[in-house]
Amino acid sequence: MATTRKLVVEVVDAKDLTPKDGHGTSSPYVVLDYYGQRRRTRTIVRDLNPVWNETLEFSLAKRPSHQLFTDVLELDMYHDKNFGQTRRNNFLGRIRLGSDQFVGQGEEALIYYPLEKKSLFNLVQGEIGLRVYYADEKPPPLKPTVAPLETVVEEKTEETKAEGPDESKPPPETNDIPAEVKETVKPPQPPPEESSPAEGPKPDEEASPPLQENATVGGEEPPASESDKNEAEAKPVEEPPQNQPDGEDIVLESEDTMSWASAPRSPLPEVIISRSVSGSIPETKNGPQPLRRSVSETASYTSEISDVSTIERSTFDLVEKMHYVFIRVVKARSLPTSGSPVTKISLSGTMIQSKPARKTSCFEWDQTFAFLRDSPDLSSSPILEISVWDSSTGIETSQFLGGICFDVSEIPLRDPPDSPLAPQWYRLEGGGAHNSDLMLATWTGTQADESFPDAWKTDTAGNVTARAKVYMSSKLWYLRATVIEAQDLLPPQLTAFKEASFQLKAQLGSQVQKTKSAVTRNGAPSWNEDLLFVAAEPFSDQLVFTLEYRTSKGPVTVGMARVPLSAIERRVDDRLVASRWLGLEDPNDEKRGNRSRVHIRLCFDGGYHVMDEAAHVCSDYRPTARQLWKPAVGIVELGIIGCKNLLPMKTVNGKGSTDAYTVAKYGSKWVRTRTVSDSLDPKWNEQYTWKVYDPCTVLTIGVFDSWGVYEVDGGKEATRQDLRIGKVRIRISTLETGKAYRNTYPLLMLVNGGVKKLGEIELAVRFVRTAPPLDFLHVYTQPLLPLMHHIKPLSLFQEDMLRNTAVKILAAHLSRSEPPLRPEIVRYMLDADTHTFSMRKVRANWLRIVNVVAGMVDVVRWVDDTRFWKNPTSTLLVHALVVMLIWFPDLIVPTLAFYLFVIGAWNYRFRSRAALPHFDPRLSLADAADRDELDEEFDVVPSNRPPEMVRLRYDKLRNVGARVQTILGEVAAQGEKMQALVTWRDPRATGIFVGLCFFVALVLYLVPTKMVAMASGFYYFRHPIFRDRKPSPVLNFFRRLPSLSDRLM
């Protein structure tokens, strides 16, 4: 039975509302509007924290499915003036929710939305709690009292036919409807003819829409919307629904909906199809009728599921067009064989063979082949040969049944959005086929053709795993298990008042976590610990709790409890969910009388972003809960054109070969290009699109060599890992809006011998902003991670552990796809091995710090040169600047800001315009790295190197650690000397400092501050003839202060 989709909004409560009645309270009610339908809750009298707990429903039966993603749910909250008059505005706040934030039933969660202002001068505060989700319900059964209704409809129909329409006579009950409601009343509709079983529709009459549940009988007016003031005056036309909440529901239908519902349906015009066939095949008049359509909606492989027809399709303007000759072999008839024949297609010296035909009423293949062609207009005219062979007698002794030849220059050119070419019947010539026909279609198209993804391509060698594919990462959640306490856990072998140690172990799949050991004497230990896991949808696993009693001989299991993940509540904020008591069952005890129990609080934290990438190259920061997603601010388009000068990655049949493919990852969407077989200069020319929610994210592209199933030196190596060729990262924030970048990037790999260039990849990328300019700039002021990361932050240990778990889950999920995305590819794209130790990275990071501080060092050097009058003109100008800033201190901040503005404006000329930044071997110190350091970087844990080499590396690391230890000691000593100024560790030094502070306080109190500042400035920039070459007394005094270094052992 068909179901009806509806939008359900649960208005739960509100908090901290604005007082409106003049007595410190308000009487709020909520009005919701969705697609012309309006609902209203009841009024909560004099309460700033009202609780409604009402469920309001909106019908989506008349809403086209592709337009559901563009609707907005508007919620307005008002103060009811009937419960406390006020001269001020009774507006309490509003929110607007896009339909992309709505989830299906079962995924909903209570979310508190902050109330927003309607205008700048509104005083709004507080938040409202909602649950919004889609629900499907079965239509109600037909009522048994339909016969009288049909009689009335039939009689009214006869009267209508006899009298005809009378436009001068007003419809009944019009005078009883209020003025504001009359504007939205539908015109009278003719009663549906299909409601009468005795009288069928006539061919010369237009078909009326079916009778709705709320339709009136005998041409009466349909129900109109009613306001609160006119509810008692207006005459009701239909009964309210039975499931209407306590509050008053206002249902308003827009004029567009009414006209759409009342528009008559015109019959489809007869479609006449003419088709040319070859030979003496008779013309088929009873062919399949094509579907009518007004606008071509040909989908391409760049479109997503959520794309709607109103969105412009990708035009493939970032890549080059690659022309293919497509041959679609559908079926054959009247073949003189009883086996499973095959078709062979030959073009330009390339021959391919189809799969064996399926024997039904005809011989069916329904297979499409694509031959690469340089251009649609060739000077020569190659011949396309299609032949049918009977393979039942063996592959080598196949019998020729017939064939067809085509001139490629006469094959039509098709480019979407053109409609697909219909296959035709062709008479087979030659062989043993005399009256055999083959149905096929041939055309010349590009990679934008909808048949291209599933076609057998010549550049992929027909490998099933070589197709282009779009993957979606599984939806990951953080599962928080709060272990509170346990009861009745005293083992029988222990006596009272004897301490016992207990530990709770939680396991989810391969994830195992344990609490700390809790010691108790009464059998009621307490932990209050949070255990975090990563869970992937769909939730089919179970969370297993095992309570262990710690003994000297080892842990002893006291009991176990299982909780299915589907029964765990979801939350999107830090509110406390209801806890539960779980009964523990002893797996070795058959008696289940008295059982111990444990107190647990379980929830899925949807307010976190599950990290699966390194923080500095993350491609998505959205939380798990879809309700918290912000609207997209733009789209990024990536054109993967091809690679050049690739090195052979493997040996196939004694010959070097590379079967390259590209993987791109952004957010939860992965794309994989087709695998170009045995080519060192592969061309893909595939274009993909992603939605951008945060511009400060990174798009990652990796190139790999596929092993597949090949004869490698005489043996099949199907289980070998795909080899890495290189990787490119593109930060979205570095792209200008609307500008297309087409660049060639080197593919670099760091191996044990150093940096190795394995080729180049040519990419085209473009970022298009879809959000308003101010909204787009407002994103830069928002935190990167969701709010829960700041309210209840995770520790570094938890982040690393959960990230490694998330990578394993994603790798296992994507490896089960077809074609699979292998785990080594996923780990390389997610940078799962970036946490390994490397002396090269240590030195590179140190040089990065030096480069950052270099600007400050230059400033200090310039100030020192100014002090010593190396440039007298500059020193005199600095004196004048000091005098001006001291006497006019209001100019200090503007001068600094103007100086930074000048620097930024000056550097604008030197910005990168064409090339995008990519991996820098010099910055990474990869071009000058020591071989021993690289070998140490690629060493596994635990090390598999010889003991002597491990000892040498350990001694080197000890030397580096000693230098780091010295630097840390110096930093700690300087801080301790600062503390010694007032701690009286050195009584004389502290006395001098305290006395000087008292003297400075008196001077600054008696002497104007500007005079003191000017004197200090002139003293600091005094001429060298007034200086002494010894260190300053202040520095000497600070160096003599004591530290705690002499107390270290």
Swiss-Prot record:
One annotated GO molecular function is: metal ion binding
Q: How does it sit in the membrane?
A: Multi-pass membrane protein
Compartments, record wording: Endoplasmic reticulum membrane
**Cross-referenced PROSITE patterns, in alphabetical order?**
C2
Per UniProt, Ca(2+) 1 binds at: S338, D390, T393
Amino-acid positions noted as binding Ca(2+) 2 in the UniProt annotation, renumbered to this chain: S338, D390, T393, S398
Q: Name one GO cellular component term.
A: endoplasmic reticulum
**Domain (C2): residue spans on this chain:** 1-112, 302-426, 460-582, 617-745
Note the InterPro entries from the entry.
Answer: C2_dom, C2_domain_sf, C2B_MCTP_PRT_plant, C2C_MCTP_PRT_plant, C2D_MCTP_PRT_plant, MCTP_C, QUIRKY-like
Q: Does Metal-binding appear among the keywords? A: yes
Region feature (Disordered) = 136-249
CDD domains, per the entry: C2A_MCTP_PRT_plant (cd04022), C2B_MCTP_PRT_plant (cd08378), C2C_MCTP_PRT_plant (cd04019), C2D_MCTP_PRT_plant (cd08379)
**Record's compositionally biased regions (Basic and acidic residues):** 153-170, 226-238
Which keywords does this Swiss-Prot/TrEMBL entry list?
Calcium, Endoplasmic reticulum, Membrane, Metal-binding, Repeat, Transmembrane, Transmembrane helix
Q: Does the keyword Endoplasmic reticulum apply?
A: yes
Provide the tissue specificity. Answer: Expressed in the vascular tissues of roots, cotyledons and rosette leaves. Accumulates in roots meristems and shoot apical meristems (SAMs). Observed in flowers.
SMART domains in the record, alphabetically?
C2
Q: Where are the transmembrane segments?
A: 883-903, 989-1009
User: What functional role does this protein have?
Assistant: May function as a signaling molecule by regulating the trafficking of other regulators.
Family that this chain belongs to: Belongs to the MCTP family.
Which protein is depicted? Answer: Multiple C2 domain and transmembrane region protein 16
Native organism? Arabidopsis thaliana
